[in-house]
């Protein structure tokens, strides 16, 4: 996952790139050719050839993190016409029932050690609050926070999914991420 994208963040070593292409585009393809019912793509996201526009809408499989990591508005999805979207989403807190399995009432604070030990996204709590404040006032009671972040997450998924469904034939599928992530 995201192997080709990783190369854009590191020095381009032609030996490593050649080995990557040989393994993922040739050797693995050869090994699975007898399993014709199993679709195979060498990387996700994927353009039309190795290291080509793996975020372009017109080809392959895309990951779209402009909403969430890029703090774009939820309607950003409506400007995109991807062929297949295999990663997108928006984080929310788990239910209060789940929160009570890992935090005491005195730890009901996003900055507490109990919450920070579960937050795997750098700046994730700030991003959740950014999107929450786009729609709602910040809640006075912590117990309202999981519910409100869940509404924002649902709105994100709904907005994107409805757009992609309206474009069936152009967009042939989407997979959202961060829904029901493991918190306890």
Residue ranges and their predicted role:
Residues 30-33, 41-44, 48-59, 63-184:
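Substrate-binding clefts and catalytic carboxylate motifs of secreted carbohydrate-active enzymes
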